[in-house]
A protein has these predicted regions:
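Extreme N-terminal starter segment of soluble prokaryotic enzymes
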Residues: 15-19
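Class I SAM-dependent methyltransferase "Motif I" SAM/SAH-binding loop
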Residues: 21-27
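Gly/Ala-rich phosphate-binding loop of Rossmann-like dinucleotide-binding domains
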Residues: 34
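Conserved SAM-binding motif I beta-strand of class I
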Residues: 40-45
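Short alpha-helix immediately C-terminal to the canonical SAM-binding loop
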Residues: 49-52
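Conserved SAM-binding strand-loop segment of SAM-dependent methyltransferases
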Residues: 59-66
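Catalytic phosphate/metal-binding cores of nucleic-acid and nucleotide-processing enzymes, i.e., regions
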Residues: 144, 232, 244, 249, ...
């Protein structure tokens, strides 16, 4: 059995946290929050197909469409979001965080300033580390947020594919209080030590690609079936809900230690 199975689901609730999701896709972060008994009060997703899925799975969640038109959606303890990575990833043009798509970080940052959540959870391509991550960290620091980050592969959680993503958890030092933060007991390390992952650190895993030649015809997506194209795009861009669940459990564990 994989060490990650069943993490944190049986932990006692102290105070129920609330979650809001930006660039929601098909709800990977929402599912991860749900695994930890954290309700998602609102989400924001511009693509019609993805919003249809979100409405089916989370019918009670307030839904917004365009983040550029979103303003003060209501307080939540955690805001999550994977702003578009097309300008950042290896497959993109490498324009970085100032590109037309990945530049939507500015909108996410605006919502963070307006809402002032206790925690922020960010997902993106690992290439962000060399294509604008310092901008993200500086912006968060200017409004009082400390941050930690890790590159995590799906394979670490027992999935048969690599898909490494960068995850960053930031926390508001004004709400938490700097005197309560013990840097030797950080969000990630307190959890990773308990699972004995490479001495308390996530590591890159070796191995071949999940995709094989058998999938080549299917992945071309040239059959003209619109639903399948949208479905593949949504799945390809989705946050792994198991990884998301682990990250939310890290936040809950950290928050409980501050009580």
């Amino acid at each position: 059995m994989n060490d990650y199975q069943g993490f944190a689901y049986n932990k006692k609730e102290r105070n129920q946290m609330r979650h809001g999701s930006l660039f929601s896709g098909i709800g990977g972060f929402e599912l991860g929050a749900q695994m930890n008994n954290i309700p998602t009060l609102w989400n924001c997703e511009i693509e019609d197909f993805q919003r249809t899925i979100l409405k089916q799975v989370f019918p009670d969640t307030k839904q917004y469409e365009d983040i550029k038109e979103l303003s003060k959606p209501g307080y939540v303890d955690i805001i999550s979001g994977g702003f578009p990575c097309q300008d950042i990833s290896i497959a993109g043009k490498g324009e970085g965080i100032t590109g037309s798509r990945s530049g939507l970080w500015n909108e996410m940052f605006r919502i963070i300033r307006e809402v002032r959540p206790k925690y922020v959870l960010i997902e993106n391509s690992p290439m962000l580390l060399i294509r604008g991550f310092e901008r993200v960290l500086c912006d968060l620091s200017q409004i009082g947020y400390n941050a930690e980050w890790k590159c995590i592969q799906n394979k670490v959680f027992g999935f048969p594919h690599n898909r490494e993503r960068l995850y960053c958890i930031a926390y508001d030092s004004h709400q938490i209080g700097r005197e309560k933060i013990h840097y030797e007991d950080t969000i990630f390390n307190s959890e990773s030590r308990s699972f004995e992952i490479q001495g308390g650190k996530f590591s890159r895993m070796s191995g071949g690609s999940f995709w094989s030649e058998d999938y080549s015809e299917f992945l071309r997506m040239d059959d003209g079936i619109s639903y399948n194209v949208h479905r593949l795009e949504a799945i390809g861009n989705a946050v792994n809900p198991v990884v998301a669940g682990f990250l939310f459990s890290c936040i809950k564990e950290f928050d409980n230690q501050l009580a």
